[in-house]
């Protein structure tokens, strides 16, 4: 509720994992006075990465990406963050906890997150997602190396050609997700 927010000491972080309970999302959105258009974007999980400024905070949409190695497909989970004066509300599309290690650090009092404001927590959450992109790039590199080895041993096998096209599609999908994020992150750093 707004009263809880105003009377709370320190930083409040509400993390919603899974977007299936729309009533809960609406309740939290109303309690933290999150703009209705931002809440609509939370529930519409096909948003491009973006940063929007509202009177009472910043709204960030980004994507947690991972590689489905078996099918050579890029899997995307939308993450939305709303950072206000003394609070951050994060919305994770999937029930898996993308921010588990950040939560552990805050609960154990490690690092600066609890001592800093909502902007620092939002930065840490965004940084966590971006760090995952390096893992994704390592996985893509591994696939390229395996593909090179496959080409040397099997020649121009049809399965090898199919994997080349699959990998090219993954790289293009990654680039498509990365470009809007670059712009949003640049705007985020300028608002600090």
Residue ranges and their predicted role:
Residues 1-192:
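Peripheral, non-transmembrane regulatory/ligand-interaction domains of membrane transport proteins
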